[in-house]
Each structure stands twice: as C-alpha cells, then as structure tokens.
C-alpha cells in the first residue's frame, strides 16, 4: 500500500523498470518488471512502451503527477542522441505531465558510489536518496524571498550539495529596493552592467545538476521568467518549490525536492 506524503521513484533501465516508494530517507521496492528497451528505437514503439508503463503506474499509485512521481532513465536511454532524448522527454511530458530525467553517465556513477556507501547493491536509487545533486543553482526573487532561499541553502548545505549561485546571502544594502539586487562583492557600473551579472548567474546553469526555483505561493518574478529559456536550452532539470501559477507556456518541470 502506498503511504501518503511519499514519493514514487521510477527507474527505467535497458531491460528492467523498477518502482520505489520514498518516505523520508527510506526507500522500498514496490515492483520490478522486465521491459526490453534496447530492442526499440526512438519511434512509436518506444513511446508506447513508456506510455503503457505509466498507465500501469496509475493503477498502483493514487496520484501520478510531477510532484509525487520522479522518472529516471539510464542504460540504453543514455545512448540516444541529444535530439532523440529531447523528443522522448517531450513525449512523456505531453502525454503524462511527468519529467523523464535521462541521467548522464558521470551522474549515474556518482549515484552508484553514493549508494554503495549505504548498501552493497549497485543501485542508483539508493544514491539518489543519499545525495541527488552535486551542484545546483537557486533562482528566485532575492527582493521578496530571501528568507525562503536561505532556508533552501541551509538544507542543501546539510546534504553536501554545492550551490553555484547565489554564492552568498550577503546583499549590497544600497541595492535593496532597486530593480537589480547585488550580492556582496558585486558592483554595477551602469544599468547595462546588470546584464553581465545576470549572464554570469545563468552561465552557471551549465555546471549544475538541477536548477531549483524558490517560488513561495507560486510566484515567479520577471527575472526568473527570463531565465527559463536558458535552462531549457541547456537541458537542465527544473524544480520549483511550489506549483508555479503564471507560466505562459508549460514545460517539463518538477515540484518539490525529494528531501524536503
């Protein structure tokens, strides 16, 4: 029986698909099924296999949405071209509203090593539960949500997750109440110089395993809205702390962290 307030983690591998329940820091295997994805190219047959499994998931789990369900893929999925991976991710999102996270080999190895610290089994889900991200960027309104951003940073620090940006919580006091908040050590030569700082922040998306967007009550500021295109272009995992309420075009995203 699936417990309330738990998350469902699904791992698609080359020949096996496993469903886990995550409650706190504890995971349990609910179901494991043999599905041969290595016999399928990126076309309708593969799409049907994924769709079929997600439909079966709905029979097991009461709620299947981007807040309660996480999808991870390794093995043959890593061998698809970038465009093929993108088309598969789009298909899953359009048909189910879920995000398919195709794990890069280096991140998969990180998960395996993390998992082995707690178990003798080479299982990426064990590693994900231990530490899901190596590096992240946090986005959100420093003007309005500094306390909430600080709370997230504290949680991430306890998990040994490196925060690429913001690198400090210290704000240049003179910038409070202006259109562009400066962090300690930053200077604004003129209003156009804000673009240099914005670009430096967004350039760190490339090195991050995920972008975490702090949006209490669903609010999304104009600055963060501007950054979405860069996040998607870099094929980054996007996680909101709350359901966003003013997206003009929905795109693949998740809600809530597994460890919060």
List where the protein language model places each region.
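Extreme N-terminal starter segment of soluble prokaryotic enzymes
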Residues: 4-8, 133-136
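A generic structural motif
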Residues: 25-26, 67, 159-163
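Structural motif
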Residues: 7, 68-70, 209-210
């Amino acid at each position: 029986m699936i417990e309330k307030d738990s998350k469902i983690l699904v791992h698609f591998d080359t020949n096996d698909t496993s469903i886990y329940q995550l409650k706190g820091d504890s995971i349990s295997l609910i179901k494991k099924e043999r599905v041969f994805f290595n016999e399928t190219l990126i076309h309708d047959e593969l799409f049907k296999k994924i769709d079929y499994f997600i439909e079966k998931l709905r029979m097991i789990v009461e709620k299947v949405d981007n807040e309660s369900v996480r999808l991870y893929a390794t093995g043959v999925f890593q061998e698809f071209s970038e465009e093929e991976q993108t088309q598969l991710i789009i298909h899953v999102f359009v048909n189910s509203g879920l995000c398919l996270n195709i794990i890069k080999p280096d991140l998969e190895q990180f998960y395996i090593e993390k998992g082995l610290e707690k178990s003798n089994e080479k299982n990426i889900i064990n590693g994900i539960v231990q530490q899901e991200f190596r590096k992240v960027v946090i986005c959100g309104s420093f003007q309005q949500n500094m306390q909430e951003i600080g709370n997230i940073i504290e949680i991430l620090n306890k998990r040994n997750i490196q925060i690429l940006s913001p690198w400090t919580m210290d704000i240049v006091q003179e910038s409070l109440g202006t259109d562009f908040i400066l962090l300690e050590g930053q200077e604004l030569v003129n209003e156009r110089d804000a673009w240099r700082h914005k670009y430096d922040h967004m350039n760190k998306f490339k090195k991050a395993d995920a972008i975490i967007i702090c949006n209490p009550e669903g609010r999304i500021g104009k600055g963060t809205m501007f950054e979405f295109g860069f996040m998607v272009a870099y094929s980054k995992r996007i996680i909101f702390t709350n359901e966003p309420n003013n997206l003009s075009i929905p795109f693949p995203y998740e809600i809530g962290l597994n460890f919060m």
